[in-house]
Amino acid sequence: MKKYILSLDQGTTSSRAILFNKKGEIVHSAQKEFTQHFPKPGWVEHNAQEIWGSILAVIATCLSEADVKPEQIAGIGITNQRETTVVWDKTTSKPIYNAIVWQSRQTAEICDELKEKGYSEMVREKTGLLIDAYFSGTKVKWILDNVEGAREKAENGDLLFGTIDSWLVWKLSGGKAHVTDYSNASRTLMFNIHDLQWDDELLEMLTVPKSMLPEVRPSSEIYGETIDYHFFGQNVPIAGVAGDQQAALFGQACFGEGMAKNTYGTGCFMLMNTGEKAVASEHGLLTTIAWGIDGKVNYALEGSIFVAGSAIQWLRDGMRMFKDASESEVYASRVESTDGVYVVPAFVGLGTPYWDSEVRGAMFGVTRGTTKEHFIRATLESLAYQTKDVLCAMEADSGIELKTLRVDGGAVKNNFLMKFQSDILDVPVERPVINETTALGAAYLAGLAVGYWKNQDEIKEQWHMDKRFEPTMEAKTSEELYAGWKKAIEATKAFK
């Protein structure tokens, strides 16, 4: 009987189930979107029960359409939108409030108070993160402070907290396993990434009872089994968990120290594997756990760019410059350069290394000769410049010079962008055959735990390149272009 690994990719707007075979190839997939709730400006919430329903639906669809029987599943891997927070009743398994999503800013005031009390340095040292509404800790505090009776129930040990991975493992196992992995725990603002424990001082700062927290386990391990009524009568091992960006790093087989990947989605997330040492950043990067496997923990530096693919959507939908995103490449290639035009797509502020949420988008160097083509090209180039900003910070912090950059996500289909990225970084850019690296990473973690794949060396062999983009631009030219970008950033920051 042929066996497969099932990957559950629980994202911000949809849930997906993807079946992988022994070669790491996609056999079949199913996807289901769910509702976004915006109760107030800047707030983003999901219904955790609806997310659970969407997961059950995609599992059923994927298996039936692929004609794969439940007993053919060797293991389940889970990857998830990180930081999104669920608090549920231990007895009924019902959430006491909506899931508060990573993007939601509803805890910004709590963060300001914590900063004013002088906690920033302690948080940075212990967690590798900044005090920000992005991370889970303040979201848990908000739920306990704002939902009637929640704090009392939590103090009595009746409530559980989890990021989305924990919630799904709890539901799949019928409430038998309350766990998370190192990569997800490292995004909560409550976990000490050095001694790998929930931290009493951080919990006290956030007034979160320890009894709510899941057990933290390696990213590749059997956490429990599916309860038969949730998996068509089968008890399948739930064997791999990692947050989406860390899973993509694993799926790209970036196992060596200094290997890095950049995911071009709505925003960009760039992670560099720093091996077994947690590198503290001096340049606005986050220090995070990549994964824990075989008794060892790998760390990573992470840079976040807020606007990437969404800038291309803006050209299409907001500026109506083309009907299909793929046309952006055609227009950009019609001109030799941007003719001195720079677009800074700071629509929601700037991320790494600037961390400025007040600044807004800008355009510079426009003349009477500027055309639509120049404008589109400048917008695409801005993705590459922002990536260089992050890479410069990574190289400065880690002391590691990048040899190649592996890429994934929607925008990597754009050959113009990938070539320009290679030129501006002066390193080769490698695009893999399988672009679903996040789901693949979760599948690999699960497959290793159940012996479906032998080891990381076997996985490394399965990474196949679709195309390698080599830098050909003269150093002088790329330096001048990048200097222009830095000027544009400074000017943008000055206009508030």
Curated annotation (Swiss-Prot):
Binding site for ADP: T12, R16, T266, G309, G410, N414
The protein's enzyme class: transferase
Regulation: Activated by phosphorylation and inhibited by fructose 1,6-bisphosphate (FBP).
Pfam families noted in UniProt: FGGY_C, FGGY_N
Keyword Transcription: no
PTM: The phosphoenolpyruvate-dependent sugar phosphotransferase system (PTS), including enzyme I, and histidine-containing protein (HPr) are required for the phosphorylation, which leads to the activation of the enzyme.
InterPro entries: ATPase_NBD, Carb_kinase_FGGY, Carb_kinase_FGGY_CS, FGGY_C, FGGY_N, Glycerol_kin
Source superkingdom: Bacteria
Protein's name according to its UniProt entry: Glycerol kinase
Originating species: Bacillus cereus (strain ATCC 14579 / DSM 31 / CCUG 7414 / JCM 2152 / NBRC 15305 / NCIMB 9373 / NCTC 2599 / NRRL B-3711)
Gene from which this protein is expressed: glpK
